[in-house]
Amino acid sequence: MEKKIIFFDVDGTLVSDTGGIEHVPESAKRAIALTRAKGNLVYLCTGRSKAEIYDFILECGIDGVIGAGGGYIEIGNQMLYHKKVTNKAVNHMVDYFDTNNFDYYVESNGGLFASKNLVKRLERIIYGDYENDPQAKARYEKKDSHFINALIEGQEMRRD
């Protein structure tokens, strides 16, 4: 039998968002297991960076990843390709954002690095008015946003 490769997008295809909480539906997990049991391979093909492909996604049984809109490719745990933005370009963007008081984050294989005010701002957007709304406060206290939990705040963004 001929082996096939099945490519899944992440957002809205493999991963669902129910009430702001990302998860892989059981039906998708079963489909991946069945596909792999037939000897086929399962790859992710997504615009997400490596750092945004959380463990709960990979635990479904993924054979490879085409991430960052094609800027990152791995088979198993072996990186085959990684297209980086130059340090000069990163520094230019960071300087512009900081000078103009933009909140932002920088994606890399090693993490999602947030500007100093971004996490607080995103918590308000994702969780709601947690200071005045009891439901928003309960959600805020759970800290159940994979994205917010992945953000690393307070690191130097400029690169040499």
Report the location of each language-model feature:
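A short acidic/small-residue loop/turn micro-motif
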Residues: 22-24
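Intrinsically disordered, proline/serine/threonine/tyrosine-rich low-complexity regions
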Residues: 154-155
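Asp-based phosphoryl-transfer active-site loop
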Residues: 4-20, 44, 93
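Short loop/turn microsegments at loop-to-beta-strand junctions
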Residues: 2-4, 61
